[in-house]
Design a protein with these regions (language model features):
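Acyl-donor binding region in acyl/amide transferases
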Residues: 345, 355-358, 391-551, 556-566, ...
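Short amphipathic alpha-helix that is part of the acyltransferase structural core
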Residues: 317-370, 374-389
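Short acidic (Asp/Glu) patches
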Residues: 74, 84, 88-90, 96-103, ...
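Conserved N-terminal entry element of GNAT/NAT acetyltransferase domains
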Residues: 290-331
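Non-catalytic C-terminal accessory region of glycerolipid acyltransferases
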Residues: 2, 9-15, 113, 148-296, ...
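Secondary-structure boundary elements
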Residues: 109-113, 156-163, 196-201, 350, ...
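Conserved nucleotide-cofactor-binding alpha/beta core module
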Residues: 113-147, 151, 158
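Membrane-anchoring hydrophobic helices of lipid-metabolizing enzymes
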Residues: 1-93, 100-102, 109-113, 129-130, ...
Length: 588
């Protein structure tokens, strides 16, 4: 065996020893053939020759060319890796050496000042030693010393403002009985410590695929058998294509909510894992065409304006420039109400909801007050809410008079403990105004004014929707967070959903069973936005209610509204932060 070989098993024995001579003359060749070591040495020889012939091309690209392995970035883009400042790219580790070659190729295409913190075996090749910072995953006193040096070097590299990448699991993905799947082991907390200490932007990545069944079967017998198979696994990936997903960068200022490095590194792992659940689907029509009616045409502006003119002065709750917020009952605004039903349907269909009818109006619209935002310059209904005085509605119609009774069944004394409350719902802002935060703020200024006008009321409740357009895993993540952190269990016993949500039973949630890694709704939103094809996070309205110190009373599925997941939420204005409340009330 030539000394230039990448791997020479005879070197396991002392040079010139009898054992080495016997091994080399008897079993070395068949063992190296069985483990594909001979094939790897031939591959490495070709790579080395190409590096010498064309030094302008980096080692990683030469290696992938010789192996005939192509990678395809199916989500995100390599260009999302920041070009300056300390960056830490973290990825799962499904294959072994191939992962390092692909990661190196991607990084070198974006930043020349990039290195990989990885198994020392990946850095054995002299052509690439300057691109690796080595650690030893095999344990022992010597490994501990080497790893301390590797972590120090990694810290210095990040401190210099350079780019570092790693596989935080330390070892290749394997079968995990507790998850009943092939998956990375828990990621090492040192990765979070380094990222936090050096304020590095973290970029999650996910490499799609897994090693052979034989690899995982032998690994269940003994982990070292898995290690022995790694060369064979590298060689059997020749002539293949690997899909890569690159997530959104996580800036260092988002680390603060994680009190421990264990929590933070679990969050990094989740951000990588969630990428594997993305779906490559084109946008579809939210409702089957045979069930959808054409939306009614808008009425003449003068007809709508006449409804506004007919309102009493007290109907105006607040205004700002061309925008006015009014409150009215159904019989006071017959034409505006039709426009509300029209624009509701437009808005909800755009996010996979909606009734499928020409107008989104129902019998509850006749029992509720309507708070709507009017643009007097363009004669547009920009958005609206409807509010019902619960005690008055129940006294006349029972709990069946509440829209939420279509989703939940209430006990007879359900509302006794809440006192005087208002049910709000069917909230929307038309698409062209949704990026303007002032629309929702103005509506809420009007809502608060209306509540204050009605003495004794301070509590608002209603269903906030998470549309069926969301990925089932997104809904499961949101639901689990709310149940753990925001559920008021006492009231939940007094209501029963007609159809209970089942998203928490999603098998994929097992990979995200680290509740401490999601200390805030913003962390959940980060996962959700990676998963959703349109990059939407947790619904804005849900975040808005929770910002107002809202609590969840229960969960249900609205079967009459495109099977939207509804969280039944309660906001007590007397419990809202006074500074925040003044902001909504329009006070300085």
């Amino acid at each position: 065996m030539a000394d230039s070989a990448l791997i020479n098993l005879s070197k396991l024995f002392p040079e010139a020893s009898l054992k080495r001579k016997i091994f080399a003359n008897t079993v070395q060749s068949p063992i190296e053939s069985c483990l594909s070591i001979k094939q790897l040495n031939n591959i490495y020889s070709e790579i080395s020759s190409r590096c010498k012939a064309n030094p302008e091309k980096n080692f990683f690209d030469h290696s992938l060319n010789v192996l005939n392995i192509n990678y395809k970035i199916t989500s995100g883009a390599a260009s999302s890796i920041p070009k300056t400042g300390p960056v830490f790219v973290v990825s799962n580790h499904p294959f072994g050496a191939i992962d390092g070659l692909i990661l190196g190729s991607i990084l070198q295409s974006q930043r020349e000042d990039s290195k990989i913190l990885a198994n020392f075996l990946l850095g054995m090749m002299p052509e690439v030693q300057d691109k690796f910072i080595s650690v030893n995953p095999f344990g022992g006193e010597k490994a501990t010393r080497a790893n301390l040096k590797g972590l120090r070097d990694a810290g210095q590299w990040l401190k210099s403002g350079a780019c570092l990448a790693t596989f935080p699991a330390g070892i290749v993905a394997h079968y995990r009985p507790e998850m009943k799947s092939i998956h990375d082991g828990p990621w090492h907390t040192n990765i979070a410590r380094l990222a936090r200490k050096h304020s590095a932007t973290v970029v999650p990545m996910h490499i799609e695929g897994k090693n052979s069944s034989l690899f995982h079967l032998l690994g269940r017998v003994h982990p070292r058998l898995r290690t022995a198979m790694l060369v064979r696994e590298l060689c059997n990936k020749c002539n293949s294509e690997v899909n890569i997903r690159i997530g959104s960068p996580i800036p260092a200022n988002q680390f603060k909510g994680h009190e421990t490095n264990e929590s933070l590194v679990r969050y990094f792992q989740m951000r990588s894992d969630i990428l594997s659940h993305q779906e490559n689907t084109e946008e579809e029509t939210p409702l089957p065409t045979e069930q959808v009616e054409d939306i009614t045409e808008k009425q003449d502006d003068s007809i709508l304006a006449q409804d506004i003119e007919n309102l009493p002065p007290s109907a105006l709750l607040c205004e700002k420039k061309a925008f006015q917020v009014y409150v009215a009952t159904a019989d006071e605004i017959p034409h505006i109400l039709q426009e509300i039903g029209r624009t509701r349907e437009i808005t909800f269909r755009a996010v996979g909801e909606g009734t499928g009818k020409a107008l989104d109006l129902d019998q509850y619209d006749q029992l509720y007050h309507h708070i709507f935002l009017w643009n007097s310059e363009t004669s547009e209904v920009v958005g609206a809410y409807r509010l019902g005085l619960v005690d008055e509605i129940i006294s006349k119609h029972g709990t069946k008079g509440l829209y939420s009774s279509t989703i939940f069944q209430y006990s007879d004394d359900a509302f006794d403990s809440l006192g005087k409350t208002m049910e709000l719902g069917r909230s929307y802002v038309i698409p062209k105004y949704q990026r303007r935060g002032t629309s929702l703020s103005l509506l809420w200024r009007g809502i608060i004014k209306f509540v204050r006008r009605n003495e004794g009321y301070s509590k608002l409740f209603g269903a906030v929707s998470i549309s069926d357009d969301y990925h089932p895993l997104s809904k499961g993540l949101i639901l689990r967070f709310l149940r753990k952190n925001k559920l008021q269990a006492g009231f939940a016993k007094k209501m029963k959903a007609h159809k209970k949500p089942t998203f928490e039973k999603n098998r994929s949630l097992k990979a995200f069973n680290y509740p401490d890694a999601l200390p805030s709704l913003e962390n959940v939103s980060g996962l959700v936005s990676e998963l959703e094809s349109d990059k939407k996070g947790v619904p804005t309205l849900l975040k808005h209610y929770l910002q107002l110190n809202g609590v969840i009373l229960g969960f249900g599925v609205d079967t009459s509204f495109s099977d939207a997941l509804d969280g039944f939420i309660l906001v007590d204005l007397d419990e809202v932060n006074p500074t925040l409340l003044k902001k909504y009330e329009g006070e300085d």
